[in-house]
Amino acid sequence: DQIDRVVSMLRDIHPGAVFLLTTPPECHRRVRRKGKKKYYYTYVTNTKVEKVAETIRRYAVGKGLACWDLFSISGGRGSAKSWVKYQLSARDRIHFNIKGYELQGNLLYDAIIKGYNDYVGK
């Protein structure tokens, strides 16, 4: 398992490190299609991302690691279209643009602060 190899390697180098795994957001992939006279490109949902997100979530639970589920937080299945619609995706439809990364950072910050406040409030 690639995730386990990376986490194990990092633990060997930094035994006291604390890990926060994150899942990827849904994204598109570019596909080539044949038109009447020539080929053209279009974008379709990359269905493998949901499987990757589920694998990361399961791994984190199994190993007792924290996991921030960006896949679900960003809207889950079908959400990539919204990120494009609201101009939060880069032109490649895989990565966010500056506004998208700022939103991602704010969402992560809010989650960390909420977790901390829940922890100290116990």
Question: What residue spans do the PLM features occupy?
Answer:
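Generic structural signal for well-ordered alpha-helices
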Residues: 3-8, 53, 57
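Alpha/beta-hydrolase-fold catalytic nucleophile elbow
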Residues: 22-23
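Catalytic His-Asp segment of secreted/periplasmic serine-dependent ester chemistry enzymes
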Residues: 27-122
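Bulky hydrophobic/aromatic packing residues
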Residues: 1-3, 14
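Oxyanion-hole/transition-state-stabilizing segment in secreted/luminal serine hydrolases
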Residues: 1, 26-27
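Loop/turn elements at helix/coil->beta-strand transitions in domains of secreted/extracellular proteins
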Residues: 14-19, 62-66
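Secondary-structure transition/capping motifs at alpha-helix termini
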Residues: 10-13, 17, 115-118
